[in-house]
């Protein structure tokens, strides 16, 4: 049955964007333009896009792997994975997560301190030191977590599918893993 041959997986990814709304600059822009207060917003890019590129690429690889190797189950992001494919999936996910974590560590140790040091010049009058979290504060903003649960919803029609339909679901999942 699906309850004994499959599991539910859900991926949560988080990345600090390096963007920050500047209310004072937004007010200045609208005042200078003679516009209403809600006519414009100034969103500062605290770090150059290039600085987060390795992290963004690693995050994209994790997401792509997750969607390639699983099938939709619920609208909340839950996806289904066969137990047969689980070990391979976890090994691949682990390798991708390691690359992601390595990119985060490299950014926090090597790139971020340099970016912050250059920010006063780069940002001009928009620079505010308080906009820049410490590396320790930033660390928790980057994550790639995988929740794994059993298929336990006895009321769910997919759990009580006949053998042919269960085999089709299993086949679809395994084909997604190819």
What residues fall within each predicted segment?
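Leu/Val/Ala/Ile-rich N-terminal alpha-helices, chiefly Sec-type signal peptides and the beginnings
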Residues: 1-134
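Acidic, low-complexity proline/glycine-rich segments
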Residues: 132-163
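A contiguous, surface-oriented mixed alpha/beta subdomain in the mid-to-C-terminal portion of proteins
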Residues: 156-178
């Amino acid at each position: 049955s699906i309850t004994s041959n499959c599991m539910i997986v859900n991926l949560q990814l988080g990345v600090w964007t390096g963007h920050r709304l500047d209310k004072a600059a937004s007010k200045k822009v609208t005042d200078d333009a003679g516009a209403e207060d809600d006519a414009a917003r100034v969103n500062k890019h605290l770090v150059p896009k290039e600085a987060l590129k390795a992290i963004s690429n690693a995050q994209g690889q994790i997401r792509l792997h997750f969607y390639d190797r699983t099938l939709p189950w619920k609208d909340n992001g839950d996806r289904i994975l066969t137990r047969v494919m689980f070990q391979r999936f976890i090994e691949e996910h682990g390798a991708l997560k390691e690359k992601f974590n390595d990119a985060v560590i490299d950014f926090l140790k090597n790139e971020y301190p340099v970016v912050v040091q250059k920010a006063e010049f780069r940002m001009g009058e928009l620079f505010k030191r308080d906009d820049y979290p410490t590396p320790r504060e930033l660390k928790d903003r980057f994550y790639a977590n995988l929740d794994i649960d059993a298929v336990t919803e006895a009321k769910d029609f997919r759990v009580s599918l006949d053998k042919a339909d269960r085999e089709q679901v299993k086949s679809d999942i395994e084909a997604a893993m190819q």
